[in-house]
Amino acid sequence: MNSRREVSISKCLQGFFSEEGTLSKSLPSYEFRPEQLAMATAVARAIETERILLLEAGTGVGKSLAYLAPAIIHAIQEEKHIYIGTGTKTLQHQLMEKELPFLKRYLESSFSYALCVGSENYVCERRLGGGAFPGQEDLFPNPDEISQLRAWAQTCRQGLRSELDFPCSPQTWHQICRVPELCAGQKCPKGGDCFYQRARARIARATVRVGNHHLLFADLQSDWEYLPPRIS
C-alpha cells in the first residue's frame, strides 16, 4: 500500500476487498461481499470529506473490517491515531483478538493497536504491597485473596483485572486497583514498571486505540485522565 495519499483510500480498499484483491488472492475461502466493499467505500468517503456517517448493515456483511480498514489506511497515510469506540467489552476483545491481527497481516502496512480501559482495571502494586498506607495492611478485607493477587502480579502480562484466573471480590479489588486520588505519579517507587503507566505509553504509540463509548466521554469530561491527549 502506498502512503501519504499517493493512492486514495477508496482505491486501496478496492485492491483489498475486491474479487481480484489481496484477500481473494491470499485466502482460498474468501467470499467477495459487495455490501462490505460498499460500506468500506462509504466510510472512506466520509473520512476524506470529514463528514459524519451513520451506517446500518445486516449480519454477515463484515461490518468490523468494513469500518476498520479505511480508518486504518487513513491513519497510516496521515500519520494519525484513531480511536475505535464500542458499545460492549465483548466487541472490544473481538477487535483486539481477531479483526486487528487479521488486518495487520493482510493490509501489508505496519500499524500498532492497543486496548484502552479505565485505570481502575489495573492493579496498583504500591497499594497491593501496602505502600499506600504503611502499617495498615490489616485493613485488607481478605488476606487470602491478597496473597493470591501478590503472586499473580509477579507473572501477569498487563496487570488487568480481566487477566485474573481466580475469583476476586469487588471489595478486595477496590482496595488494590489504581485510583487517581491515590496515584503517586512520578514519585511512585514502581516508576516505569507501573502497569498503568506502561499501558498509557503503549496507547500513546498505538495507531489504533480500542475502547468503549463510556471511556471516551469520561475522558472528554475529565480532560484526558485515562487516555493520552489528542485522539485524532
Q: What is the role of each PLM region?
A:
Residues 49-53, 77-83:
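Short, surface-exposed connector motifs at secondary-structure boundaries
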Residues 1-26, 79-207, 214-217:
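A substrate-engagement module of RecA-like helicase motors
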Residues 217-223:
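Flexible, glycine/threonine-enriched loop-and-boundary segments that flank and lead into catalytic domains
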Residues 49-70:
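Walker A/P-loop
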Residues 44-45, 65-78, 98-102:
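Walker A/P-loop NTP-binding motif
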